């Protein structure tokens, strides 16, 4: 997105989003906060900052992951287990005196520890109890939260989605907020329609380039982004009237598995997803409108009692 203008991607203070409804891809932030060892503290801070600007945050929790992500989840588990084993090995060596706790060892242990961060069921339930007490809405998705977040923004039930997941752009989410700083009350805003205009690219072509470059659904079938873009520019210069990927298949050997490309395309088709999950979306829509409720201070104190919070 290097070629995009400041109209499509720019840093903004949260004041710009005042009085808006923003859906949140919650799992991303639970992992970030868990990495800091302060899930409850940061969820509380996040809600406090949003309420300061009268932003209605709608936290969307993941449900059951799709079968298509099985390979990714297995790989992530192996990576976490490997990192944890290496961390424990280093820790044991230091504790037994076999190794010194020097700066390099400390850095390596800290790096490894971040690689096996896990969000527990307790973290999730604690977060929900804080949200209920603080008077902000949350939704429990039956599947992954991405589809639901994009749907709510595309259909006008929310203004934007807060997520660092690039998949939001593939779902065609019109407005995405990334890189949130709770310290500085700012974030980076992405206008998807303007981005496509700047790139002179359709949503379909954007998705194909992103899919070919690799998503969570085609880990073993990835191409270089720069190579894919280079081929797209060659396609543009040819002025061929066929779709980009059809041209690729006919004139190159770049796409190894056209059927797999088509399969992943369907996974990012929000209209297709809506057809198969109509009841879930209907249930969410019936719970509208999203709004802030009055804070229940007693329940909030109870929810944060084990986290060292002191209320004046």
Regions found by a protein language model. Give the residues of each.
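Short alpha-helical segments and helix-capping/turn motifs at coil-helix boundaries
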Residues: 5-15, 41-48, 146
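Short, hinge-like loop/turn segments at secondary-structure boundaries
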Residues: 75-78, 157-159, 178-181
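Noncatalytic, basic helical substrate-engagement surface that gates or grips nucleic-acid strands
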Residues: 17-141
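Conserved NTP-donor binding/palm subdomain of two-metal-ion nucleotidyltransferases/polymerases, i.e.
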Residues: 168-171, 175-176, 182-188, 193-194
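Acidic carboxylate-rich catalytic motifs and surrounding loops in phosphoryl-/glycosyl-chemistry enzymes
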Residues: 61-63, 137-148, 220-225
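Acidic, metal-binding active-site segment of PIN/NYN-like and related structure-specific nucleases
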Residues: 149-177
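Acidic, metal-coordinating catalytic cores used for nucleic-acid/nucleotide bond scission
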Residues: 64-67, 145, 167-170
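Non-catalytic nucleic-acid-binding/docking modules located in mid-to-C-terminal regions
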Residues: 4, 8-18, 53, 185-312
